[in-house]
Amino acid sequence: MEKDLKKMYRTVVSDHFPDRLSITFGDVTLEYRKKTWKITQNNGEIVEQGLRYGENPGQEAALYELVNGNLVLGECEFISPGMGLVSSLVEEDMIQAGKHPGKINLTDVDNGLNVLKFLMDKPTAVILKHNNPCGAASADSLARAFERAYRADRVAAFGGCVVLNRPVNKETAEVIANYYLEVVAAPEYEDGTVDILKKRRDLRIIRIKRIDRLAEYRTLRFVDFKSLIDGGIIVQQSPLCRVLTPDDFILPEVKHNGRVYRINRKPTDAEARDLLFGWFVEQGVTSNSVLYVKDECTVGIGTGEQDRVGVAEIAVFKAYQKYADALCFDRYGISYKELELAVRKGEKPKEMKQEIDEETVRAKGGLQGAVMVSDGFFPFRDGVDVGIREGVTAVIQPGGSVRDWEVIEACNEANVAMVFTGQRAFKH
């Protein structure tokens, strides 16, 4: 008999983790309570359970909320109980659940909040897949912010999670309902919007009540745990982003072989706005990473690579691919890959694809006038040269390489502005 492999993705795995968890640091004990939810299944049965499964089907997992304990280590005071976001979700917040959430559903929302805490001044949308942003944008309206974030990478956004920093209105709900997403999370949903969103039967509609106070979390630290395969644990403080306004930028100036190298051009106000936006999105991207931003919208995001010049090139490749895909969808109502296949099978004329390709190359994948963001310093100028060739006009990076002088020289040759942050933004 044929096995229905799809069933494993719907099956809730009963976990054996305890209802209470305590972690002691010296004389301070942090106490956690496991989260479970009563959710009505498709067959009408109400099942009380925690996470559906962990990273993969079959992996038991549990979510715990911090309920007691105030930890101070040295001069660092960690987040206190009562500040829950994802970990304090209750049934009423799961407006449409469909099935119990899995680990990745909730960690996607969490990382979206991690980015949005820096971007609360304007309506902003962050779309995530596998805990990485695939599109992020700010705009004058929430609907426009979502649409820009989605178009930044339509392919990756399919089945993704969108986190929004404003209550969802009808205009935004109508736009979201046009696309297939797994999760939408927002501070609130205005009257009539939930019915619109429920047209997508499998969409998880989640309310995060404290999003309106998300800016407070910029300076709140938590204990970050990493377990090793031998059962050991590494603990670290969560990072604090020191760059919060353009006033925090550092203008590059270094000495090499007795000569002083300094950047010739400061960023314009528009460039500074994009640099700051990109640096905030960078806080949620897996390292090594390089991203390109234009008009407070991501253009290409390179994630999780082992060399910096390589990830800069991958982000360029993605920008071209995503630009061509959006162009193709606007013009023909199909994805670029669908057009590519149709041309290969002789179902559509090759000129259709050629036109898209030529227009994408002329526009340099939307990279002309964009800014370049790097979570680590450039060890050689080759990384920044990748962006310069595509027409970027400004760069933000930590600085601190022995070849900073070389990177400064590359930017000056192209009249490209550059700023240092003085702080790395690695995330693993």
In which residue ranges do the predicted regions lie?
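Amphipathic, non-transmembrane alpha-helical secondary structure
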Residues: 147, 170-174, 313-316, 381-389
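Active-site/ligand-binding-proximal alpha/beta "capping" segment
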Residues: 264-269
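Glycine- and Gly-Pro-enriched alpha-helical subdomains that act as flexible
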Residues: 134-155, 299-380
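Active-site loops and adjacent core secondary-structure elements that bind or stabilize anionic groups
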Residues: 1-195, 199-253, 271-280, 284-289
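Short, acidic, Ser/Thr-enriched surface-loop or helix-capping motifs
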Residues: 293
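C-terminal binding/interaction regions
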Residues: 178-214, 236, 366-428
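Conserved helix-loop functional segments at active or binding sites
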Residues: 118, 284, 321-325, 389
